[in-house]
Amino acid sequence: MSLAQLTQQPVQTVQASSTVAEAARLMCMHSVGALVITDATEVTPLGIITDRDLVWMIAEGLDPHTATVDQFVRSRLHSVCVTESLSDVTKAMREHGVRRLPIVDPEGRLLGIVALDDILLLLGKELADVAAAITGELKQEHRLGAARAETGK
């Protein structure tokens, strides 16, 4: 499976100038736990704001109606290019300690987002497919062995 196929699309975004309250409304409206923060063009990813960021902000006493999401923009956004492998994505998540990464094209334009949960679901399905194939082969071998035993060969 390619990274493009695994990527959640359309990706939910919020402009950097939006308030945290608006980001929370968007998360609720789209049933997502994170939004990619973009510039005014909504093409260039600048950062990510998560539901955990919202909890932290409230715990710190910031006003969600005046605080803007650009406060969550780090100096360097970690993203991966759509041409990279799934292995590269999991390595980047591990190295940067993140659970979600924006997926960009070679020019840096936002294409989607991939979450660790998506990867785990894919790998679980792949393992189940392998287990089913092995089980099928073992059943076939057992049937052949039983048939040989009946015929005495």
Model-derived features: positions:
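A glycine-centered beta-loop-beta connector
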Residues: 27-30, 35-52, 93, 101-117
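Tandem CBS (Bateman) regulatory domains
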Residues: 1-9, 50-79, 85-94, 115-153
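The conserved cystathionine-beta-synthase
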Residues: 13-31, 38-39, 80-97, 104-105, ...
